[in-house]
């Protein structure tokens, strides 16, 4: 029972931060959204809102990391795979009324210079996405340096395009980023997927078609 209450709190906190960021979310908001009394929040998270946010962001980051591989797994052409990631992200954003923003990205810029615990947490999530994505693309047959470059460019382009898409209420930023990023990699083969990699983006990112 304690675990389900804890998970309900983290899920509610992540969902609230996805829509509102960190500063606009209060403990009463989390209690109301999770169905847990305020006392339960402090029982499970004596560190209060910062501790809840940190745990929620790490949990959400692990879930979002599974999204990119979920799209890429079935593709054998890197360019087509990258285009598919952005197309799926655009579909997800439009389908949620441009509200499907990753909580990690929503909070990261907001707290980077003000709350060190959360800066470290979001930095850790991004690092996991980049390292996991690099390992994933290496497993799919890309040279190490290319795998890293593709992952960094993919995550960076997605995060930036999500912000523009949400602000403009338009999928154009995602579709344009997908066209430009995928074009140089058309015809680049991806090796068949053999085994899953724990922590690989798309298996951690929130991310990333993590319509963040």
Tell where the protein language model's regions lie, with residue ranges.
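All-alpha amphipathic helical-bundle segments outside canonical DNA-binding/catalytic cores
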Residues: 80, 120-121, 139-155, 172, ...
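Hydrophobic alpha-helical bundle segments that form small-molecule/ligand-binding pockets
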Residues: 114-116, 126-151, 187-195, 199, ...
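Amphipathic alpha-helical segments used for helix-helix packing
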Residues: 53, 80-84, 95-117
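Hydrophobic alpha-helical connector segments
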Residues: 68-100, 139, 150-154
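Helix-turn-helix
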Residues: 8, 12-55
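Short hydrophobic clusters on alpha-helical segments that form packing/core surfaces
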Residues: 9-17, 89, 133, 158
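Amphipathic C-terminal alpha-helical segment
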Residues: 92-94, 155-173, 184-194
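Hydrophobic alpha-helical segments that form the core
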Residues: 103-106, 145-164, 176, 180-184
């Amino acid at each position: 029972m304690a675990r389900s209450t804890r998970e309900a709190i983290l899920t509610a906190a992540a969902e609230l931060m996805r829509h509102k960021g960190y500063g606009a979310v209060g403990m009463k908001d989390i209690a109301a959204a999770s169905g847990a009394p305020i006392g339960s929040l402090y029982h499970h998270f004596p560190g209060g809102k910062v501790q809840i946010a940190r745990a929620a962001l790490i949990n959400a980051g692990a879930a979002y990391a599974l999204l990119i591989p979920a799209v890429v797994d079935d593709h054998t052409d890197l360019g087509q795979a990258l285009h598919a990631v952005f197309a799926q992200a655009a579909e997800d954003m439009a389908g949620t009324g441009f509200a499907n923003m990753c909580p990690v990205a929503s909070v990261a810029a907001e707290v980077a210079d003000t709350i060190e615990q959360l800066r470290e947490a979001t930095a850790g999530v991004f690092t996991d996405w980049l390292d996991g994505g690099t390992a994933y693309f290496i497993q799919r047959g890309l040279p190490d340096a290319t795998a890293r470059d593709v992952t960094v460019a993919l995550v960076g382009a997605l995060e930036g395009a999500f912000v523009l898409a949400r602000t403009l209420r338009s999928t154009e930023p995602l579709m344009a980023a997908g066209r430009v990023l995928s074009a140089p990699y058309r015809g680049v083969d991806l090796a068949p997927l053999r085994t899953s990699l724990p922590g690989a983006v798309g298996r951690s990112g929130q991310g990333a078609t993590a319509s963040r």
